[in-house]
Amino acid sequence: MTTMVSVRVLGISGSPRKGRNTEHLLRAALEAASKVEGVETELLRLSDYRVLPCDGCNLCVKKEGCPLDEEDDMGELKERLQEADAVIIAAPSYFSSVPGILKNLMDRSRPLKMGGHLLSGKVISALSVSALRSGGGEAVVEEILRFGLTHGMIVVGGCGDPLTQSWSGIGTLQGDAGWRRTSDDGIALRDSRGVGRRVAEVALTLKRGRL
């Protein structure tokens, strides 16, 4: 009898704004992931949590944990990251970088690395939104993926049509006829779905022990 394998894909919206452009792309990716048999998805908004900035105390290096966990919600977020088999992080471009709330999460995740690479082997991918076509979307994706590589995670991109589809979903609000929402950016939505589907497939393959 074949044992049913299931994986959990956690989508993290790193935008301070709820239900807006970044979340549209993330929902598209998670919807595509959920259509892969054996995959459960969950959307988490960082804007619902309080995460203080790292103060560089280095107690995590000494394996003493982070004292700030007692003052904010980072302890819960670390648990959610560890429970997931795969993570898709979506963020808008703020001056060609990630928003402060997401950077706080990245910096404060250091105890997970110092505690024994607790996120290693998990799948990660990234989505982004920028206002201008050259507004820093790719820089945001690269920053998120560097975060994953620092934790020893497995970076995955979409594998759609090699001539027309990108490996990542990057939305832009600047269209040919003026401004738009990502819900009207068909290319970004399509590419985001491709990312979600591929993340789900790779996470399942890894859990089944085929890689």
Residue ranges with predicted function:
Residues 1-118, 164-211:
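N-terminal beta1-alpha1-beta2 submodule of the flavodoxin-like/Rossmannoid cofactor-binding fold
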Residues 100, 118-163:
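Short, glycine-/small-residue-rich phosphate/pyrophosphate-handling segment
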